[in-house]
Amino acid sequence: RLWKDTVNFYARGYVSNTLPSFYMRHYHSNHYYWDNENMDKEFRTRVEGELNISRWKTNLRAGVENIKNYTYFNQNAMPAQESGNIQVLSATLKQDFRLGILHLDNEVTWQKSSNETVLPLPQLSLYHNLYLLAKIAKKVLTVQLGADVRYFTKYNAPAYTPAIQQFHLQAADDQVEIGGYPIVNVYANLHLERTRKFCREDH
């Protein structure tokens, strides 16, 4: 307990040692063809801790993962493996606030890959949702009006190849960073018994 509030702490961990999927090992089509019989098993270990304070609407989670023989699609949209170890550190804070019918939900994630060339990640991701939530018309109609915003720092996001329907590393001669700008949505949500109407404008 913390100042008479209940505090929950959780610790988790897992270990996995599995072959890459059949799709990563075998694929035949007109434009792409591969048979990777000698792929090694992908070995993953992860430990994380989580702190939750319900009354404060606070949740904090942090962890570290080690990946050996990470399997991915390379710059040529072909399956590949990184024989070394890759570490990924991450921490996420969720904090919600409420004042009457006014709500503000927040989520902040920090993450770091030890090999940005093979496993690029945005270092910081933010999500905020500000809205009014109330019941009207004799409390049978629930109305939610609000706006949310998403943001992540610039990074070399994966490219996409429709022929194999997969994301892969960007080509070396055509590197483009995305991110570094907010994505804002304004929305309205109405709920009356079994009827729900939702509209949203994206930017």
What do these predicted ranges mean?
Residues 1-203:
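Exposed, low-structure sequence patches enriched in small/polar residues
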